[in-house]
């Protein structure tokens, strides 16, 4: 059984005026993930943390990503995923993106890197849709590409890596939980400029 262990980084998105388009990857925190290839079409998920996230693959952001990859490859393979979350869900630093992107990148590696980064973003956006109700890539793109990214479009997908100097980032967190889906419901659909 082939297995890979990865770390999937937290991210900060909605940088300055870049709502849903600008994001950057952080060195820490990062989720630990171990993914194994199975010879039968199923997804098994184990959690090694206290967040009680769903282990049913259709209700888990990483599980949805793995299912979409299985569908694209013909469904003759499966995955066993163990997640150790170090990014608290609802923390605002890309917890769902780390799970979704990490699953996509790890699966791609086990499959011989058959998908491009853009395709991995597309798979991972399925996880974000489960988490927030909307496919968006502002956290997914930096998680997969690294560094700072600009999502110019998701239809068609157009992502630009932005060169950035080495820098230190300080994240001040009020330790409250706000789920992305809830935060999106508060936002107005249109913002007037006057």
What are these regions (language model features)?
Residues 1-91, 105, 109-115, 146:
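ATP-binding N-lobe of GHMP and related small-molecule kinases
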Residues 93-98, 193-194:
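Short glycine/threonine-rich catalytic loop with a Thr-x-Gly-x-Asp
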Residues 15, 55-62, 97-100, 117, ...:
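Generic structural signal for well-ordered, non-membrane alpha-helical segments
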